[in-house]
């Protein structure tokens, strides 16, 4: 088996548990030990980008492309998490299910965006993946795209009917999340798409206040005044949930070697 992250040793203190607030939007529950028995051959081949092996397996026998591993993940999930667009195309062309949910109600599209696999995400969107499913924290695919600061995917999702006003459990619409991320281009784009400029999160932070805060940071940055970036920041502007999806390196689950 392969250990994906160091587990606490008996007698030692493990990582500090996140507060309930930090769990409202995103979690980091993807670190675990994968046993050989957890994955079938189809999952291993998909995770490694072995399209040729999958095709050979499909020719030999009738396969259930949507069969899940012990944690409810399909071959398509594994291909997207590891960025194997060729395998994603193969599975989609063979009519596998697109909107299979994992244990946290995340779609495969969300996972592709969380792992910053844009090519895989685009294939899913073009193939009709539902952009409006919410995970257990209330996030849609648009929240994930905004958090990854991927303007092109945000635009693509909206063009395919994604809801621009969904609030996650922290009270963040995609617009508020973009402001929290200081993603100026995405903020401006969402406003051109008539995102609600009066959206309020659970701390009652009015959007206009956050915009002014962002503009102050931008102005201070241009003036090369690092101390000024924190001046005039309302306490309410602190986000309810501090945790965001980790980088792709820590999110991609690796499979055991054969």
Swiss-Prot record:
Name the gene. ANKRD30BL
Q: Which InterPro entries match?
A: Ankyrin_repeat_domain, Ankyrin_rpt, Ankyrin_rpt-contain_sf
Positions with biased composition (Polar residues): 218-232
Comp. bias intervals (Basic and acidic residues): 243-258
What protein name does the entry list?
Putative ankyrin repeat domain-containing protein 30B-like
Which parts of this chain are annotated as the region Disordered? 1-21, 216-258
- One Pfam family name is Ank
Q: Superkingdom of the source?
A: Eukaryota
Species this chain originates from: Homo sapiens (Human)
Query: What are the ANK repeat spans here?
Result: 71-100, 104-133, 137-166, 170-199
Q: Give UniProt keywords alphabetically.
A: ANK repeat, Repeat
Record bears the keyword tRNA-binding: no
